[in-house]
């Protein structure tokens, strides 16, 4: 399994993330070509090699030319969904922007849908966020781990005047995640950086055991008494067994007084907050009323964010949670070519006690549905073609 460890000893921002990925071997041409699939005009990447305290690093800046419109969350999600980006990149990019908009909305006391991203800042954030996720995808990263995050201190100038560091939106994004104070009078973790790492990281902690393959540094723009760099380490975890045991939290609540039209939004927002799965179960309540048991599974570091989403988007007054163990397959995404077009598929591998390998294949439903509609073919035929092509892969 290919993993990426973000060592955020001096914080994280979108451009630092892009720089670290390029320093670790991400092709600038592949990155730029992929980002062109957004259909976004008036930008270019400036990449240069710099040194900070004698350490070589990659500096990335998004140059925006011409005027740009104000964009709300729906506009940005439309750009992402209508792009030619791979399905996993679309999904993760949308999740990051939803979390960023949710935090900005909390700061200003408005709904996430009302948050607008200012002209140049919107383009910069789009390229930073989508580019970072695309970069991880192109490098084949399957798991992201991050160090705890330094808060920084002082004040930062922004469109709304001087604000304390960390910026209010950053603090909302960092709820439920490990942070620590520093004496640096600078903004170390930006809202974009916070949205990226809290959405993408599977866990936070010390440097993991792995076979180290690449190390790269992404440069920050602020001059500090120490290297203002994001260190990215790439590596592989080799295990004698392919299955993995891990713990997750199970969060539950029973609801019998909510408009049923609100349940789909509750599910969507809970998943966007970091749940790995969520579902509804019909139950009979104590007074004989029909009700719904809402269950969500999430990593331990996502508890605060997922709980906040459930309280915000449901009528519940309390949650139960417990720690469960689960076995997970080694997973990866792949793209297979079918007579109808290219289809992304999810591959899972599990080794049973006798050593026999069990492989599960799941074509991405939404992609199959769109391809079937475009080709005028039955969905089941596109799905079957994707399964057949995936079985021919030597994916593991």
From Swiss-Prot:
<dbReference type="GO" id="GO:0051604">
    <property type="term" value="P:protein maturation"/>
</dbReference>
<dbReference type="Pfam" id="PF01969">
    <property type="entry name" value="Ni_insertion"/>
</dbReference>
<comment type="similarity">
    <text>Belongs to the LarC family.</text>
</comment>
<dbReference type="InterPro" id="IPR002822">
    <property type="entry name" value="Ni_insertion"/>
</dbReference>
<keyword id="KW-0456">Lyase</keyword>
<keyword id="KW-0533">Nickel</keyword>
<dbReference type="GO" id="GO:0016829">
    <property type="term" value="F:lyase activity"/>
</dbReference>
<protein>
    <recommendedName>
        <fullName>Pyridinium-3,5-bisthiocarboxylic acid mononucleotide nickel insertion protein</fullName>
        <ecNumber>4.99.1.12</ecNumber>
    </recommendedName>
</protein>
<dbReference type="GO" id="GO:0016151">
    <property type="term" value="F:nickel cation binding"/>
</dbReference>
<comment type="function">
    <text>Involved in the biosynthesis of a nickel-pincer cofactor ((SCS)Ni(II) pincer complex). Binds Ni(2+), and functions in nickel delivery to pyridinium-3,5-bisthiocarboxylic acid mononucleotide (P2TMN), to form the mature cofactor. Is thus probably required for the activation of nickel-pincer cofactor-dependent enzymes.</text>
</comment>
């Amino acid at each position: 399994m290919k993993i990426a460890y973000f060592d955020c000893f001096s914080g994280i921002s979108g451009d630092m993330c892009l720089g670290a990925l390029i320093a670790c071997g991400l092709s600038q041409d592949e990155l730029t070509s992929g980002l062109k699939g957004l259909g976004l005009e008036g930008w270019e990447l400036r990449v240069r090699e710099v040194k900070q305290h004698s350490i070589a690093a990659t500096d990335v800046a998004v140059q925006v030319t011409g005027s740009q419109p104000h964009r709300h969350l729906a506009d940005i999600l439309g750009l992402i969904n209508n792009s030619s980006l791979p399905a996993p990149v679309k999904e993760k990019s949308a999740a990051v922007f939803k979390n960023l908009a949710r935090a900005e909305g909390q700061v200003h006391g408005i709904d996430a849908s009302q948050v607008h991203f200012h002209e140049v800042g919107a383009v910069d954030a789009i390229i930073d966020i989508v580019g970072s996720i695309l970069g991880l995808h192109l490098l084949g990263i399957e798991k992201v781990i991050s160090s705890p995050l330094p808060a920084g201190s002082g004040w930062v100038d922004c469109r709304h005047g001087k604000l304390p560091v960390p910026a209010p939106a950053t603090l909302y994004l960092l709820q439920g995640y490990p942070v620590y104070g520093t004496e640096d009078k600078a903004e170390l973790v930006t809202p974009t950086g916070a949205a990226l790492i809290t959405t993408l990281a599977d866990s936070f902690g010390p440097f993991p055991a792995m076979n180290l393959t690449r190390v790269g540094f992404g440069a920050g723009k602020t001059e500090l008494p120490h290297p203002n760099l994001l260190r990215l380490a790439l590596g592989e975890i080799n295990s004698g067994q392919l299955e993995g045991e891990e713990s997750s939290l199970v969060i539950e609540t029973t609801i019998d007084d909510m408009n049923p039209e609100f349940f789909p939004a509750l599910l969507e927002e809970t998943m966007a907050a970091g749940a790995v799965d969520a579902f509804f179960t019909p139950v009979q309540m104590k007074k004989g009323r029909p009700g719904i048991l809402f269950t969500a599974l999430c990593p331990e570091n996502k508890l605060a964010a997922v709980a906040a989403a459930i309280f915000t988007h449901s009528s519940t007054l309390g949650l139960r949670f417990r720690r469960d163990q689960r076995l997970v397959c080694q997973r990866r995404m792949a793209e297979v070519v079918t007579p109808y077009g290219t289809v992304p598929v999810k591959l899972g591998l599990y080794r049973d006690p006798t050593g026999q390998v069990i492989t599960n294949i799941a074509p991405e439903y939404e992609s199959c549905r769109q391809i079937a509609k475009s080709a005028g073919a039955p969905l089941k035929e596109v799905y079957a073609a994707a399964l057949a092509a995936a079985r021919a892969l030597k994916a593991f």
